[in-house]
UniProtKB/Swiss-Prot annotation:
Ribonucleoprotein keyword on record: yes
Family the entry assigns: Belongs to the eukaryotic ribosomal protein eS28 family.
Keywords: Ribonucleoprotein, Ribosomal protein
SUPFAM superfamilies per record: Nucleic acid-binding proteins
Membrane-crossing residue ranges in chain numbering: none
A GO term for molecular function: structural constituent of ribosome
Protein's organism: Kluyveromyces marxianus (Yeast)
Name recorded for this polypeptide: Small ribosomal subunit protein eS28
GO term, biological process aspect, one: translation
Length: 67
């Protein structure tokens, strides 16, 4: 990651559940720090909990909902 890559900071407001073939991915709802009215659902690999701040390299894509 170089200094020219634009990133977006987002705060985890709710952990929705585990997904992936072995449950190695967590689906979370995040709220953007710059625009707190906007929330999206993302998939996160690794440990995550409510209140964590994520650095999103791409902030437009939203994850599909769990079944």
């Amino acid at each position: 990651m170089d200094s020219k890559t634009p990133v977006t900071l987002a705060k985890v407001i709710k952990v929705l559940g585990r997904t992936g073939s072995r449950g190695g991915v967590t689906q979370v709802r995040v709220e953007f720090l710059e625009d707190t009215t906007r929330t999206i659902v993302r998939n996160v690999k690794g440990p995550v909990r409510e209140g964590d701040i994520l650095v999103l390299m791409e902030s437009e894509r939203e994850a599909r909902r769990l079944r």
